[in-house]
């Protein structure tokens, strides 16, 4: 009986594992192929499409069939052409819809970033929109592949050549040169590519710095006093603690005005360089140029536990220092922008999902950069092209059938290539700090010594401090709220 239960459980587990292994996979219509080799017979490295797969992309398959065509599927099913409303039912046919046994997902490759040298905002934009190989031609071919007409100038027969780039408000317009004559229907109505709504986001991981100029610590003040034991017994169970607040003065300059346009997506902490410890934060969604200096304050302390013989005193010395650091820095800012295609669509074939044939004027905007919405995202539409009705904009399957998968992948990779602009400047900081509290050899005392300028502190057990602290002088050196205390040690 126990064996039967175990066997039943094993069968259930096996069934679950098989169900997981057979989870549905997307069928990309651009990879479907019709073979006329007989019922349920496909070419090498292809297999028949089953009923469920055909149903998931039925509109795409029917769109590729003749009016009264009937073609086979796997397991004794057929799919019928638009004259039969794409009905799928049991039957047989001499041709078969097939799909690769190892289909390519056709993902858009991610290229390395296109780095633009540092400059002001107009410099950065100008360099991008005038780059023929990396920008003008890829965006022109995108418009051409989608079905826009006349994406080139009058003096060239090739897409993306003889293009004019003009300033348009805060953006730029790329359009084929219209000088001289041209032949063809509405050849003077050149497709335009508008580049606008530029935005720049700081990449904190891109930080680099040049040669660091860092001073050795410079002694600015030495404070000397005494720890005095007036009692008849040695004192060693007390901590002498110096506490103070100190500010690190820092500043940064930005070489070009682009920094005013650069924002931080998340809270940004300035990287530590050298020995100067500094905590600088720029809040999320703030301009990089909104904070070019400051004096963050840090509370610090130093302690020592001296042993003072009876009726003795030991010298106590505190040294105060300052240090400074400076270096050139560079960050990268991710550049995003809107790409608006405007023109009329070719009647002989275009990729708008309804494939109009009346040459309509069409405007469409893609966002190159962070995701905004489905309508403007090339990557979203491309990745969901296997779901009929989900992408109500461009028929990317059609572009693949017309131009080939590798061609479209290569073009879209160039269009979506990340763009980064350099942000450069100079950074400097100065900080103050105290060295260790140093103690010297004990000296016998005949009587307590008092000074009007000394800080006289007692632990109440015979140990007291006489150390001169001039608050005004120390504040001028960058040390505030300075205090000395003598307290019983917590871990005697």
Curated annotation (Swiss-Prot):
Gene: ahh3
GO MF terms held by the record: toxin activity
Record flagged with keyword Methyltransferase: no
Taxonomic path: Bacteria, Pseudomonadati, Pseudomonadota, Gammaproteobacteria, Aeromonadales
Family matches, as Pfam families: Aerolysin, APT
Interaction with host N-linked glycan: annotated segments: 68-84
Protein name: Aerolysin-3
Cystine bridges: 42-98, 182-187
Region (Interaction with glycans from host GPI-anchor): 346-355
Signal peptide: 1-23
Location in the cell: Secreted; Host cell membrane
Domain comment as written in the entry: The C-terminal propeptide is required for normal protein folding and secretion; it maintains the aerolysin precursor in its soluble form and prevents premature heptamerization and pore formation.
């Amino acid at each position: 009986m126990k064996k039967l239960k175990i066997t039943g459980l094993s069968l259930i587990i096996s069934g679950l594992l098989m169900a997981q292994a057979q989870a549905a996979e997307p069928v990309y219509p651009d990879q479907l192929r019709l073979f006329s080799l007989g019922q349920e017979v496909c070419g090498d490295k292809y297999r028949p499409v089953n009923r469920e797969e055909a149903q998931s992309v039925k509109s795409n398959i029917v769109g590729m069939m003749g009016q009264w065509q009937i073609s086979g599927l796997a397991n004794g099913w057929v799919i019928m052409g638009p004259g039969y409303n794409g009905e799928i039912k049991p039957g047989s046919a001499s041709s078969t819809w097939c799909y690769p046994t190892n289909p390519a997902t056709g993902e858009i490759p991610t290229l390395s970033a296109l780095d633009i040298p540092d400059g002001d905002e107009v410099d950065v934009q100008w360099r991008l929109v005038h780059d023929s190989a990396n920008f003008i031609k890829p965006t022109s071919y995108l418009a051409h592949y989608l079905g826009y007409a006349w994406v080139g100038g009058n003096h060239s027969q090739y897409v993306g050549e003889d293009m004019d780039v003009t300033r348009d408000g805060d953006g730029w317009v790329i359009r084929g040169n219209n000088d001289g004559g041209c032949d063809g229907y509405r050849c003077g109505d050149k497709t335009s590519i508008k580049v606008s709504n530029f935005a720049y986001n700081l990449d904190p991981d891109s930080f680099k710095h040049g040669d660091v100029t860092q001073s050795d610590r410079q002694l600015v003040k030495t404070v000397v006093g005494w720890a005095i034991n007036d009692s008849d017994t040695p004192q060693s169970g007390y901590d002498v603690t110096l506490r103070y607040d100190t500010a690190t003065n820092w500043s940064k300059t930005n070489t070009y005005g682009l920094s005013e346009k650069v924002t931080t997506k998340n809270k940004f902490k300035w990287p530590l360089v050298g020995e100067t410890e500094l905590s600088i934060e720029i809040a999320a969604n703030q301009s990089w140029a909104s904070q070019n200096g400051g004096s963050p304050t840090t509370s610090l302390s130093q302690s020592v536990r001296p042993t003072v013989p009876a009726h003795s005193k030991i010298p106590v010395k505190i040294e105060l220092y300052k240090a400074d650091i400076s270096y050139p820095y560079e960050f990268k800012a991710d550049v995003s922008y809107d790409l608006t295609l405007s023109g009329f669509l070719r009647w002989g074939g275009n990729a708008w999902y309804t494939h109009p044939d009346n040459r309509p004027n069409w405007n469409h905007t893609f966002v190159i950069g962070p995701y905004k919405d489905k309508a403007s995202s090339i990557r979203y539409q491309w990745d969901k092209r296997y779901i009929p009705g989900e992408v109500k904009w461009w028929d990317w399957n059609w572009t693949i059938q017309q131009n080939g998968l590798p061609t479209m992948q290569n073009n879209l990779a160039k269009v979506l290539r990340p763009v980064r602009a350099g942000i450069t400047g100079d950074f400097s900081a100065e900080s103050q700090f105290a060295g260790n509290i140093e103690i010297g050899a004990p000296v016998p005392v005949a009587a307590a010594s008092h000074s009007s300028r000394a800080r006289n502190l007692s632990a109440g057990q015979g140990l007291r401090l006489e150390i001169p602290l001039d608050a005004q002088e120390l504040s001028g050196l960058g040390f505030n709220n300075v205090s000395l205390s003598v307290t019983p040690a917590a871990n005697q």
